[in-house]
Design a protein with these regions (language model features):
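Extracellular, repeat-based ectodomains that mediate carbohydrate processing or recognition
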Residues: 1-139
Length: 139
């Protein structure tokens, strides 16, 4: 059973782990075929000692969310919902070069659906968005 998002890292000497979110609803990946899961695989972006953890969670209305920590050792996360609408089965992706060169976080966002057990999910064509954040102003 999966419950909460966690982050794992090695400081060069030892492995550490921290819980990022506190989900209440467990889920399992048992069964055949592709599973519609209530959370997305997170996208983790690191820069200047800060960690940005981009995710989608059904418990938060399946909107685009970001958890931010200025120090992993302290493990204090601030979670912000970046959209006020559901993106359903969306998986995070961002412009990696723009982040590396300019510390700008541009997320590709599109409402998507995922059928469970290899079933198709009916959905009309959806708009594509680029959610732009300049993390230089967040420090």
């Amino acid at each position: 059973l999966f419950r909460s998002y966690r982050i794992v890292w090695n400081d060069g000497k030892v492995w550490h782990h921290r819980q990022v979110t506190d989900r209440k609803t467990p889920f399992t990946l048992k069964g055949g075929g592709t599973k519609m899961i209530p959370i997305a695989r997170p996208r983790i972006v690191v820069g200047g000692g800060e960690v940005f953890y981009i995710f989608r969670d059904e418990e938060r209305g399946s909107c685009v969310s970001i958890a931010h920590a200025t120090d992993l050792a302290i493990s204090q996360w601030t979670i912000t919902d970046l959209t006020d609408f559901s993106v359903d089965a969306w998986e995070p992706s961002h412009d990696t070069e723009l982040w590396k060169k300019q510390r700008k976080l541009h997320l590709f966002v599109q409402h998507t659906r995922q059928g469970d057990g290899e079933r198709m999910a009916e959905i009309e064509p959806q708009m594509v968005y680029v959610l732009e954040m300049d993390m230089n102003t967040k420090k």
